[in-house]
Amino acid sequence: MWLEESQMKSKGTRHPQLIPCVFAVVSISFLSACFISTCLVTHHYFLRWTRGSVVKLSDYHTRVTCIREEPQPGATGGTWTCCPVSWRAFQSNCYFPLNDNQTWHESERNCSGMSSHLVTINTEAEQNFVTQLLDKRFSYFLGLADENVEGQWQWVDKTPFNPHTVFWEKGESNDFMEEDCVVLVHVHEKWVWNDFPCHFEVRRICKLPGITFNWKPSK
């Protein structure tokens, strides 16, 4: 009986000794995968790196996902961009399409409640990125309107409007039926801008600045 108990105790002590080794191997493998490939990192707090200090950016967003963007040709490093979970990162900004319908003003209030604004689009690359997130069957409000002065378009986040970087559908904008707001709509196999009544209800896209910090590849 004593021999059997001793053997059982001896056998029982072998496996616990392996646990730290297994854990170490798994941890090293995971960390290696993170640094070798583009790594998604989820954090519990939405933080911004500013002049060497980490400060809390927003109480609304308590978890973020960070993605490493590859360096541009000729660059010596790249950028990590962190966005709230479920938001999509692109060139230091975060984007979030919503699938319920609201008026333009309701949409902007909804985005503001998430520490963001209705989306601004300032480049063709940004237009192409945003539209790949959308459902072609629906229209989506942009953060662009000319409610104050007809024909003087303004972005809701005060970004300067560039009349040379626009994606209007042919014949737009035409202010038909007091169309003072703008939607993204898929027409003739491409996404374009249409002026649109602000009180109509459609889907929307919110945008906020991401948390960014630079990285350099190891030599």
From Swiss-Prot:
Tissue specificity comment: Constitutively expressed in myeloid cells including dendritic cells (at protein level). Expressed in the macrophage populations of bone marrow, spleen, lung and lymph nodes.
Protein's organism: Mus musculus
Localization, UniProt: Cell membrane
Protein name stated in the entry: C-type lectin domain family 4 member D
Transmembrane segments: 21-43
Coiled coil: none
Pfam family, one: Lectin_C
Positions in the Cytoplasmic compartment: 1-20
Binding site for Ca(2+): 172, 194-195
GO biological process: adaptive immune response; antifungal innate immune response; defense response to bacterium; Fc-gamma receptor signaling pathway; innate immune response; positive regulation of canonical NF-kappaB signal transduction; positive regulation of myeloid dendritic cell activation; T cell differentiation involved in immune response
Function comment: Calcium-dependent lectin that acts as a pattern recognition receptor (PRR) of the innate immune system: recognizes damage-associated molecular patterns (DAMPs) of pathogen-associated molecular patterns (PAMPs) of bacteria and fungi. The PAMPs include alpha-mannans on C.albicans hypheas and mycobacterial trehalose 6,6'-dimycolate (TDM). Interacts with signaling adapter Fc receptor gamma chain/FCER1G, likely via CLEC4E, to form a functional complex in myeloid cells.
Extracellular-facing ranges: 44-219
SUPFAM superfamilies for the chain: C-type lectin-like
Subunit structure, as described in the record: Heterodimer with CLEC4E; disulfide-linked. CLEC4E acts as a bridge for interaction between CLEC4D and FCER1G to form a functional complex. Heterodimer with CLEC6A; this heterodimer forms a pattern recognition receptor (PRR) against fungal infection.
CDD domains: CLECT_DC-SIGN_like (cd03590)
Lineage: Eukaryota, Metazoa, Chordata, Craniata, Vertebrata
